Amino acid sequence: MASFVKFANTTFLDARFPLFKNVSFELARKQNWAIIGNTGSGRTTFLRCIQGSFTPSPSTSFSYPFLKGKSDSPWQAIQLLDFKSSGQQRAAYYSERYHSFRDKEHDTTLEKWLLGAYRGNEKFASQHVQEAASMTQLSHLLPSSLINLSNGQSRRAMLASKLVQRPQLLLLDEPYAGLDVTSRSVLSSLLGEMSNHCSPKIVLSLRPQDKIPDFITHVLELKNKKITYQGPKEQYIPMTSHSTNIPVKPQMKKSKPITIGKPLISMEHLNCVYWGRKVLSDINWTIREGERWALTGSNGSGKTTLLAYVVGDHPKLFASNIKFFGKSIGPGTGISIFDIQENIGHCSPEIHNHFPKQHTCFEALLSAWSTTFTIPKLTETRLAAISSILEEFELKDIKDKPLSSISVGMQRFILFCRAIVKQPRLVVLDEPFQGVDTKYVHMAHNYLNEKLSPSQAMVIISHYEDELPACVNRRAHIDNGKLVIHA
């Protein structure tokens, strides 16, 4: 039986520059592969090589045996879905944080959106949409508004948008990024069911710290665009078990004793309703100096909406009972939005999606002193702060590179650094380590554990317990818009 894809000592070129040199790889019909590697290892590029996005040399060394004698083109038969890239990650839905910026007139249903994604004969469009929705357990949500989909449902909607094309091979780049435990389990079950029926065949990319799904049979490991292992999953020694020459201090087992100081943010009886749906319900929360909060909750629970209030970036802010740094928001004796944001460092998937990728890494850090993404004046104080961060996280070699030229994971890490560089009174980290290598996560933990001052506070969101730094000394959980603060 013909294999799906075959490289035989192939060099892949992009504008005559080699991406991978002399690689050999074969995807057999009964195999499901995981491409594993650190940020910048070439995972996404390798998936695009499989898709046929780059020039193979020699041309005869690369083939799609499963298409031999068929009229299907590779671009029809092979679909690539990049969950971590800017823009695409939010393509299927509107983020909670921006719900209230949207007008119902611009909303659409899931069914209409999937019909719009279909590229085949219109006569079969409805049938293909129904089948794709069934495969992703979304049939009951077809009449629903995209706005009301949770993160996990939206991820499945993105998957359905590719399945409507009926691909024979589906390439998924970091499909589990940003999903809570339940959503990861549901998605894994769906992908496993598809793989059992070989409809479609699945290849996905993962970080070294990600759990390899049960349905995966083979692993290909990449390091610096070179294959370091390919073969059965059972024989694979995970990259995280390899020895490393990178000195990384272990996380502190206990957080430093810190005196809890005065309130920085305080909210009372906060409610938020979008078109009849109560997103936040009677929230009472105070964030004080010295506190290191972990805010948890499932996808769609209201976390991001709550943080939009915390950072002063919600359009209903003026109608809410919130004090920032001891002052109410508003004219006169109140505090302005600009004053609020000047005292807060913030990173999130939304900021990453909207951040200008033409900025260099240095310029991205400098923009921390701007209330927008523009580049403010460079002063000696700012230069010293940026230089310290570049030194702290070993980023000097990339400081002059545009964000567009580095991996998505490194882009997100630069924006984490942007959130801390000016030592703001409040650091707000919404999924800061999505797609970030373990090395940099450890370095970030060491900084947060040891170098946040007693007068600073922190709030961090993550769906992975091991992405929370040891300095966390307060926890809150949000469920269906209700906040529970743990002792």
From Swiss-Prot:
The keyword Ribosomal protein does not apply. It holds the Pfam family ABC_tran. ATP binds at residues 297-304. One of its GO terms (molecular function) is ATP binding. It is found in: Mitochondrion. Signal peptide: none annotated. InterPro entries: AAA+_ATPase, ABC_transporter-like_ATP-bd, Molybdenum_import_ModC, P-loop_NTPase. GO terms for cellular component: mitochondrion. Belongs to the ABC transporter superfamily. This is Uncharacterized ABC transporter ATP-binding protein C323.04. It comes from Schizosaccharomyces pombe (strain 972 / ATCC 24843) (Fission yeast).
